[in-house]
């Protein structure tokens, strides 16, 4: 690009640069993920100050540079200011932004991903705090499905046999293997590890645990039910409601917490990198306070 160009983008990340500039990571509909400098954005009276905030959607005029592009003008189309009303809502939004940054391509249109992110940010903005985990879990699964990397939860990844939750046995569990790519009826066989070693591995890895450990969990019947609903009820587009899926409040928050952690482990294992925003998610929801029970 030899001259200025226009794009519609949402700010996903902002970092201080120099004395008064701001370095922005933006997802645009037309050009995918870009990094631009917002000159003087940190000055008190800068016209780019508010427009360079997180989750602000702008019509952008950008001047290409040798290493970094420069933001010349920005006209705000919409913003998701209410995401900051609760720490849990803001953290969930940052979680999604982090995942989108990992998924988005550069120098290619990303219209569907852009619309998908905005759809879930709008949903989060309107959700009561008790439903944040449910909306986040739906959004994460939808983003994984969009990228073609959603976990298999309808059948065993090893035997390809269908799996049905068993509610008659209160101790019934099904394995979920990040390495195998989803549910497995024989966790030891799927991971080629002895059962004693599997049982000694923590279900939720510590912050210091590397993603290469390929963590696993055991799902209860209700947790598998939710994951199977998520995989079969995805809307055909961001503007279409979820079909055949109970409202977020239908399941208790602890179930959604288990779903989020399972999907988080899967993502971190697949991408071989941590979801840094997840640390705050743990602070918000674990252990669950009475408000979230």
UniProtKB/Swiss-Prot annotation:
The keyword DNA damage applies. GO terms for cellular component: bacterial nucleoid. InterPro entries: ARFGAP/RecO, DNA_rep/recomb_RecO_N, NA-bd_OB-fold, RecO, RecO_C. Keywords: DNA damage, DNA recombination, DNA repair. It holds the Pfam family RecO_C. Gene3D superfamilies: Nucleic acid-binding proteins, Recombination protein O, C-terminal domain. GO terms for biological process: DNA recombination; double-strand break repair. SUPFAM superfamilies: ArfGap/RecO-like zinc finger, Nucleic acid-binding proteins. Involved in DNA repair and RecF pathway recombination. NCBIfam families: reco. Belongs to the RecO family. This is DNA repair protein RecO.
